[in-house]
Amino acid sequence: MWRLRRAAVACEVCQSLVKHSSGIKGSLPLQKLHLVSRSIYHSHHPTLKLQRPQLRTSFQQFSSLTNLPLRKLKFSPIKYGYQPRRNFWPARLATRLLKLRYLILGSAVGGGYTAKKTFDQWKDMIPDLSEYKWIVPDIVWEIDEYIDFEKIRKALPSSEDLVKLAPDFDKIVESLSLLKDFFTSGSPEETAFRATDRGSESDKHFRKVSDKEKIDQLQEELLHTQLKYQRILERLEKENKELRKLVLQKDDKGIHHRKLKKSLIDMYSEVLDVLSDYDASYNTQDHLPRVVVVGDQSAGKTSVLEMIAQARIFPRGSGEMMTRSPVKVTLSEGPHHVALFKDSSREFDLTKEEDLAALRHEIELRMRKNVKEGCTVSPETISLNVKGPGLQRMVLVDLPGVINTVTSGMAPDTKETIFSISKAYMQNPNAIILCIQDGSVDAERSIVTDLVSQMDPHGRRTIFVLTKVDLAEKNVASPSRIQQIIEGKLFPMKALGYFAVVTGKGNSSESIEAIREYEEEFFQNSKLLKTSMLKAHQVTTRNLSLAVSDCFWKMVRESVEQQADSFKATRFNLETEWKNNYPRLRELDRNELFEKAKNEILDEVISLSQVTPKHWEEILQQSLWERVSTHVIENIYLPAAQTMNSGTFNTTVDIKLKQWTDKQLPNKAVEVAWETLQEEFSRFMTEPKGKEHDDIFDKLKEAVKEESIKRHKWNDFAEDSLRVIQHNALEDRSISDKQQWDAAIYFMEEALQARLKDTENAIENMVGPDWKKRWLYWKNRTQEQCVHNETKNELEKMLKCNEEHPAYLASDEITTVRKNLESRGVEVDPSLIKDTWHQVYRRHFLKTALNHCNLCRRGFYYYQRHFVDSELECNDVVLFWRIQRMLAITANTLRQQLTNTEVRRLEKNVKEVLEDFAEDGEKKIKLLTGKRVQLAEDLKKVREIQEKLDAFIEALHQEK
């Protein structure tokens, strides 16, 4: 039935559409036109004219996916105008788009539902963590109550402030463009840019002036840093030298090391180095020849020496003092032009400007290092070897320039120090004095000539050198004045020879070759030579070098054997003195004695590890109890014992033990352990070893012990671990057997007996001697002691009446005692009564506690069975057992820390201290003293000098 009805309704709809619609004749398919907007073509229409039917329809839209409704449709009369077939494509496109939005909407709704369902499934899979909410601290949930986030937000800079702090990129781009224009040739902005730059030149000038001080300060700091690392480098080089010596001395089987043959001048230089150390140590002066270069400041001493060495090796400055300590330069012939220091293996290639600059810088650093705080110059010598082709073999010493006035920045004694250094070198009767005089200044301003004439009045070992002759020829009006100087007629001094040299034009960057060429050219064209005022052999540094070398070797051959004989006699005297004073001892110098002492000290430190654990624990436990016994008795036991019942006693004890463990006990235990380690270490270090003990090491051992103890620090985590262990030990109240019970009673009796003895002594000092001592030793009581005695007797009567009297006197009791004493004619102060009562009651309490302790000997059975007996409560025994057990456990823990960690750390500190002392020569001289040490040092030095002199003399004879 319903199908018939549906068909009837469909027919009615069709008939209505046919009746009221007019279509377009053609082949347009009806299913592609919209229900409302399309015109329907009908084959039975009488005309082909388009009409606008009055069609009524509902607002419901239908698509191809929906069925037509079964109810009757009501069409509204809509009139359609004529539209061509080609203009219907927008309607078709709109229809399709309207269909598409339903697809998208449906997909979105379905996808959202699916996503929500998936999210719910995942949420169900996550476990419920609400029951673990207690793990998070409450402060996290209440953080907004403690922290004002709004206040923090206001304190932070705003976005506008941050924008202000950002760089101005427009200015940066503008600056870069200006810079680009500056480097671009021919740019129109170049002129303007440079004009702006000229305008800022004045500001830059002031900035440079202000920055100059900073640069000087930075250079000074850099110099100090270089000196610091120079010391480290010297120490490493010294260690390397010693190791190399050990390797060379090692005699492997079947291996023969080749012995290098040294040159004659090198052997002589080594002799002078050893003699220099010997002279500085014993304040003496050897008589071996050397060329001493002296002169006024800025007279050209260093330049002459550089011309002889054929290299600019010294630091120089315009008018300021640069030579601050003597520099010994050993010149020898070799294939390569190199320089090296005595205590360093680095070679400086003098043909390279980089190495020359490094050498000058190194010499300046060594000079500054030699100069002590508050001084300007130093007498310590810097030893430098220079080798090269064509160099004359000799040894020269460049001394600081002689000055007439001490300027600001110099030490007050600078002038006297320079004179003393110069005299010390020139007073050697075999020293060749190379006197340098500036020819460009007036002869009357010379200082050094007077000094030289004093040291060598006959001129038998002086060579006079006139520098800057080119300037003198230009400035001096009378050339004959130069002739008078060279002939020795102007200065009040005599010399072996007179020379005139030119050492440059005053430019420090000139090379040696350029200076030599200039010197030769000058003398070839000089009027002084042309007019025979100067002789040819008296000019140029080449002739000077040859003359000085010949004179030097002549003096060496004449004096070296005499010096060797004198050192042989000195050696014989020292050896005889040693045999007479120390016949059974080896000749050990200071370094060898230090090595011997070092081995002994390390052996004694190792002995600490051989101490038995039992000994460690005994001394630790005893020392710890001595440290804490007063606190245990006075602050824990006595206050708790004043309580009326055992519950209050235990509560008081637990509280006080907890406070003590948390604050004081671990620190006290570590202090005791550290002091015990020091005592044992000192005992091993100072314990005499019998007849083999050498007291010469006592000062060194004491210094090593003190320094090692000062450097040693206990492990920082020891207190934390001890606190836990001690707290657990004091918490244990269970005594397991009768032996522990008896040990606790014995420990308690010892502690109380010691306190009782101290109390008896205090009362005796308070009341004076008793009748026995008064009769036997003729001692009497003072008036104050008599008052204390009467007060004590009165208080003892009160205690006998009430043996369970509390620890403190009431005010009425004090009044009663005072009135009783006044009735007997004794005036007493209430404070005196309280002081006397404290000692009397303390003695009474300790005696009562000892009696109670004796009763508790048989109380272990009651304690073990937990019997409640008010007459026999032994809580104080349990307290002392807890203290005793804590002491034993603490001693065991500290012993483990000592043997496992601290002893090894102390041994490491001792090794470090010994290494530091080994590098400090002054420390060894201070700690290893005595006639025996000094005699061995002298003997070693003299033997070394004599052996080197003999080797040099032998080589000198072979060369002849």
Swiss-Prot record:
Report if keyword Transmembrane is assigned: yes
Residues on the membrane's Mitochondrial intermembrane side span 114-770, 782-960
Q: What PROSITE patterns is this protein classified in?
A: G_DYNAMIN_2
Give binding positions for Mg(2+). 302, 323, 398
Regarding how it is modified after translation, the entry says: Cleaved by OMA1 or YME1L downstream of the transmembrane region in response to different signals to generate soluble forms. Cleaved by OMA1 at position S1 following stress conditions, generating the short soluble form (Dynamin-like GTPase OPA1, short form; S-OPA1). AFG3L2 is involved in the regulation of OMA1-dependent processing of OPA1. PARL-dependent proteolytic processing releases an antiapoptotic soluble form not required for mitochondrial fusion.
- Which Gene Ontology terms cover its molecular function? cardiolipin binding; GTP binding; GTPase activity; GTPase-dependent fusogenic activity; magnesium ion binding; membrane bending activity; microtubule binding; phosphatidic acid binding
Q: Where is this region: G4 motif?
A: 467-470
So which domain of life are we looking at?
Eukaryota
Q: Where is this site: Cleavage at site S1?
A: 194-195
What results from changing residue 302 to A? Abolished GTPase activity
Variant or mutagenesis effect after changing residue 775 to A: Does not affect ability to bind and bend membranes
Among SUPFAM superfamilies, the record links this protein to:
P-loop containing nucleoside triphosphate hydrolases
Region Paddle region: what ranges?
736-856
Q: Mutating residue 631 to A: effect?
A: In interface mutant 1e; strongly decreased ability to mediate mitochondrial fusion
Report the domain remarks.
The paddle region plays a major role in driving mitochondrial inner membrane fusion. It binds lipid membranes enriched in negatively charged phospholipids, such as cardiolipin, and promotes membrane tubulation. A conserved intramembrane region, named membrane insertion loop (MIL), within the paddle region inserts deeply into the bilayer, further stabilizing the interactions with cardiolipin-enriched membranes. OPA1 dimerization through the paddle domain promotes the helical assembly of a flexible OPA1 lattice on the membrane, driving mitochondrial fusion in cells.
Assembly and oligomerization: Oligomeric complex consisting of membrane-bound and soluble forms of OPA1. Interacts with RCC1L; RCC1L acts as a guanine nucleotide exchange factor (GEF) for OPA1 by exchanging bound GDP for free GTP. Interacts with CHCHD3 and IMMT; these interactions occur preferentially with soluble OPA1 forms. Interacts with PRELID1.
UniProt-recorded name of the protein: Dynamin-like GTPase OPA1, mitochondrial
Give the organism the record lists. Homo sapiens (Human)
